[in-house]
A protein has these predicted regions:
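Hydrophobic membrane-embedded alpha-helices
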Residues: 1-387
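Extracellular/periplasmic envelope-modification machinery, especially enzymes
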Residues: 162-163, 215-219, 241-242, 309-317, ...
Length: 490
């Protein structure tokens, strides 16, 4: 989808597939721990999530911040808020409040915009385990009912808001797309599946082939594979046929896609299923293990390698370059950051520090805390001291004055380069709309006297007025903010 491939209009729906998978996995972990121990260790649960998610995210945020400081200083003002929202896992609400569109933009979209989905997931991880533990007092069935009811309510909220405010056409649907309240149906359907489907608990590969019910079991597995194959075809159909401005999508379509995805996951999760074995080939396993890093890095990489802007070429070579860079960076992150930390690298470092000091525990804690505090303070001061040019808000309407009318010669344009923003060189306006007006003509230089003035000179526009035919306005509803300005100019 982000490669702008026209034959995959629904590529953005991959996020919803991962929502269902995340809801399924997290709920499975919580339910099985509660059933096994009678309680959930929230401390260990969130520590595991932190070790899995935070190192790669912090590496991304640090890399993006440094890159912006060095090469994209004009975007620092907006990036500061984006980074803070990402650290707090509220990016989706941050972009809703800033009226940022996921589907339409002028110039470079926010480099961290894709973190909205991680914010939705983390907000779910924060609340859902508490609900599961409370509902588990009445068993799995209660958890399933709660999940299904909440999934339906989320779908209804999206549908009602879409109908009331005209989403997705004529108005932009980003509010209901970003919102946790309106886009949680995938996570919740995955959670419901986790309470109803855990075939690995009853499957013993050593005896599965000799039990009396061999025929019946193999038949059920075959049915599961057939349904899974049909579900896979359904997901592919969504990707190839349903675009971001489909009314169906916002009036129940996301719930349908989530249900189809849940059926696919159910088939893949069966340990005896043929479909699961087919999807477990090494290339797919490789991508699956690194999927988090691939998702984190793909959007920033794509935003600094745009065809026609940072890159002067387009086509499949550019696509291969962008994908290759993403996979390479994700591999480095997985191998040298995510995996070591997940396997206890920080704990081993602290153990070594404790072993080398008289009062090791306090010294190790102070060392780590001091390094983190110093890094955060340095990062915050660096961002605070950098000023963007110009510090315009995302939703502001930008009014720019060109260097000359369309009839100006190349020499005249070069003679006054400071009279216009560097639009042709690719500087981006993150505003929702823009107005481009021709400026007054440059002051005349020394010229030779003409032998004789024309008999009837053509009338020229009054000073301070602009010929309306020379005005071009681009944008959507926010362009109305420039109406008074245009009227004053003529």
């Amino acid at each position: 989808y982000h490669l702008d491939l026209p034959w995959v209009p629904g590529g953005f729906l991959g996020v919803d597939v991962f929502f269902v998978l995340s809801g399924f996995l997290i709920t499975t972990l919580v339910v099985e721990e509660v059933e096994r121990t009678g309680r959930l260790s929230y401390r260990q649960f969130y520590l595991r999530r932190a070790r899995r998610l935070l190192p790669a995210l912090w590496l991304l945020l640090a890399s993006v911040s440094v890159t912006a400081l060095l090469f994209f200083r004009e975007e620092i003002v907006e990036l500061r808020g984006d980074v803070l929202a990402a650290l707090l896992y509220v990016s989706n609400w941050w972009y809703i409040a800033a009226d940022v569109s996921y589907f339409e933009f002028t110039g470079r979209p926010p480099v961290l915009q894709h973190l909205w989905s991680l914010a939705v997931e983390e907000q779910f991880y924060l609340v859902w385990p508490v609900i599961v533990v409370a509902a588990m007092a009445a068993g799995r069935r209660r958890v399933r009912r709660v999940a299904l009811v909440l999934a339906v309510l989320s779908t209804l909220a999206m549908a009602v808001l879409s109908i009331r405010y005209g989403y997705p056409v004529p108005n932009d649907p980003s509010r209901v797309y970003f919102g946790t309240d309106t886009h949680a149906m995938g996570l919740l359907l995955g959670a419901a599946l986790a309470t109803a489907w855990s075939p690995w608990r009853r499957y013993d590969p050593a005896t599965a082939w000799v039990r009396r019910s061999f025929v019946g079991r193999r038949f059920r597995v075959l049915i599961t594979d057939v349904l899974g194959a049909a579900a896979l075809a359904g997901v592919v159909w969504f990707f190839l046929n349903v675009g971001e401005f489909s009314d169906f999508l916002y009036r129940g379509g996301f719930l349908v896609l989530s249900a189809v995805t849940a059926a696919l996951i159910a088939a893949l999760a069966h340990p005896a299923g043929l479909l699961g074995r087919a999807m477990a080939v090494q290339p797919l396993r490789y991508l699956g293990e690194r999927s988090y890093g691939i998702y984190l890095w793909h959007w920033p990489v794509f935003m600094v390698t745009r065809p026609g802007f940072e890159l002067g070429v387009d086509g499949w070579p550019v696509h291969l370059l962008r994908v290759g860079l993403t996979l390479g960076i994700a591999e480095l992150s997985y191998r040298y950051v995510e995996t070591p930390i997940r396997h206890g690298a920080i704990g081993r470092l602290m153990s070594r520090a404790r072993a080398r000091t008289p009062d090791g525990r306090q010294a190790a804690t102070r060392l780590v805390s001091g390094v983190l505090a110093l890094a955060l303070v340095a990062w915050a001061i660096g961002l605070a001291m950098v000023r963007a040019d110009p510090p315009a808000g995302r939703s502001a309407t930008s009014v720019s004055v060109g260097a000359g009318a369309s009839s100006a010669s190349a020499g005249q344009a070069e003679a006054a380069p400071a009279a216009r923003p560097d639009v042709s060189s690719g500087d981006e306006m993150r505003a929702a709309g823009s107005v481009v007006l021709p400026p007054p003509a440059p002051p005349p230089g020394p010229t030779e006297p003409a032998p004789e003035p024309p008999a009837e000179p053509k009338p020229e526009p009054a000073p301070g007025r602009v010929d309306p035919s020379q005005v071009s306005a681009f944008g959507d509803s926010v362009i109305f903010g420039a109406v008074d300005y245009l009227r004053d100019r003529g």
